[in-house]
Each structure stands twice: as C-alpha cells, then as structure tokens.
Amino acid sequence: MEERKEEGEAEIQEHGPEHWFSKWERQCLAEAEQDEQLSPELQEEAAAAAQPEHKQQKLWHLFQNSATAVAQLYKDRVCQQPGLSLWVPFQNAATAVTNLYKESVDTHQRSFDIGIQIGYQRRNKDVLAWVKKRRRTIRREDLISFLCGKVPPPRNSRAPPRLTVVSPNRATSTETSSSVETDLQPFREAIALHGLSGAMASISVRSSTPGSPTHVSSGPNASRRRNGLHDVDLNTFITEEMALHLDNGGTRKRTSAQCGDVITDSPTHKRNRML
C-alpha cells in the first residue's frame, strides 16, 4: 500500500508541468507525438505540394494543348475545304480539354486532403502544447478562449464579461464595368508558346489601332484575307481574328455614342428642328 501511495504521489507531484500528468496521460501524449508524422503516401504528396512548380508546369502544358486544339478547330472551321471532316480537330480539342479538367480536379482533391490532415495534426499539437503549460485544473473559459482565439474575461469582475470582437477589414471589391471583354491573354500566350510563333505572344490585341500591323480592315479586303488563310500560321490567324472582332465591336460602340451626342447636345440640330 505504501509503495502504491508513493507512486501516486510521484505522478501528481506539482513541481513542474511534467509531473502534472498521470502515467496513462503521458502514454497518450507520447502516442499523439508519434501520430504527428504523416503516412508515407501523404508525405510524398506534402513534399510535392511544398514544391508546386512541377504541378503548375504540368497544368500549363495541358492548358497549352487545350488552347492550341481549340484554336486549330476554329481555324479549320473557317478555312474548311470541300470534303474535309472536322471530326478529328473536334476530337483533339475535346480530349485536350478533358485531360486538363481531370488533372485539375485530381490536383485540387489531393491538395484538399493533405490540407485537412495537416490541419488536424496542427490543431492537436497546439492544444496539447497549450495543455502542458497550464495547471492541473483547466478553467472552462480558458479552454474556450484558446480555441476561439479570444482573450479570457476578467475573473474578479462581477459584471458580465464583454467581449470586444474586432471585425476584420472588408476589402471592397471594385468591379470595373467599362470593359466587359474577357481577358484572353493567357489563351494567346499558350498558343504562341506552343512552338508556333513566339513573336506574337506579347502583342496586345485591344490596343491595336487602324494603323497598327495587327489591325484588319473589313470590307473587300476581308474576302482577300480569307482566301489566303491556308498559308497563315495558327497564332497569326487567331490574333487577326480577335483583332477584327474586337475592333468591330469598339467601332460600333463609338459610332452609337457619337450619334447620341449629336442628337442630344448639338445646338444646331435643335435650332433647325424648331424652324
């Protein structure tokens, strides 16, 4: 009996945090420290996630294939020759887009699983480290304040505790309604960097003017341009098509705006109408 009493007193002797836990509690803590290591599979995934260059390079390569296949499908549709089937270009584009989607979903799921596992382990590690630093008896408000990341209320005050929650700064999202066009710069860069024509990758289609080399005028020259499309490389063809459609859209917007200004703001027009 005396030996058991001495062992119990030695286990709960309060000379330091290491003496606050019983033998069973120390065994649980030791097992928890051993479980902090990830499984071999998750360790490989975590090592790959720590160096995302390989995954990003693979996704970028798949995106290049998808962009090139879609652009080739559009070119073959515009420059379709009699008796030429569009099934093969369509099949290539569908396959490239499907591979890009599958790889993106798999990468996201693996990263999500690793994040959850690491989050659980980090939470347990933080809570156990906090418990080791506390006394044998932990107050309820101390535990809740630690888990919620708040300051515990004062213990001597009789008034109900007031928790001041500082709301985080809400970043105001500024949406620019002036430009409704989709940014297709990554799409054009993917086509240009696919080995077709790297010189056209940095040209901005939206900033092209009627005097710039990328501007394509509509009218009789359009038919002449389409007759020679078979000799144009894919990147140049897509760049000219985007410039043509974007410039035509901008011209229509500017024309309608100018007409509205003339009707509403011109004093000569108002004077003639009154006469």
UniProtKB/Swiss-Prot annotation:
Transcription keyword on record: no
Record localization: Nucleus; Cytoplasm
Phosphoserine found at: 167, 212
Compositional bias (Acidic residues): 32-44
Region (Disordered): 32-51, 155-181, 204-228, 250-275
Post-translational modification: Ubiquitinated by HUWE1. Promotes HAPSTR1 degradation through polyubiquitination.
Keywords: Cytoplasm, Nucleus, Phosphoprotein, Stress response, Ubl conjugation
Pfam entry (one): TAPR1-like
GO biological process: negative regulation of signal transduction by p53 class mediator; regulation of cellular response to stress
InterPro entries linked: HAPR1 (IPR040308), HAPSTR1-like (IPR029196)
A GO molecular-function descriptor: ubiquitin protein ligase binding
Biased segments, Low complexity type: 172-181
Start-end of Polar residues biased regions: 204-221
Family: Belongs to the HAPSTR1 family.
Function according to Swiss-Prot or TrEMBL: Acts as a central player within a network of stress response pathways promoting cellular adaptability. The E3 ligase HUWE1 assists HAPSTR1 in controlling stress signaling and in turn, HUWE1 feeds back to promote the degradation of HAPSTR1. HAPSTR1 represents a central coordination mechanism for stress response programs. Functions as a negative regulator of TP53/P53 in the cellular response to telomere erosion and probably also DNA damage. May attenuate p53/TP53 activation through the E3 ubiquitin ligase HUWE1.
Protein name: HUWE1-associated protein modifying stress responses
Gene responsible for this protein: Hapstr1
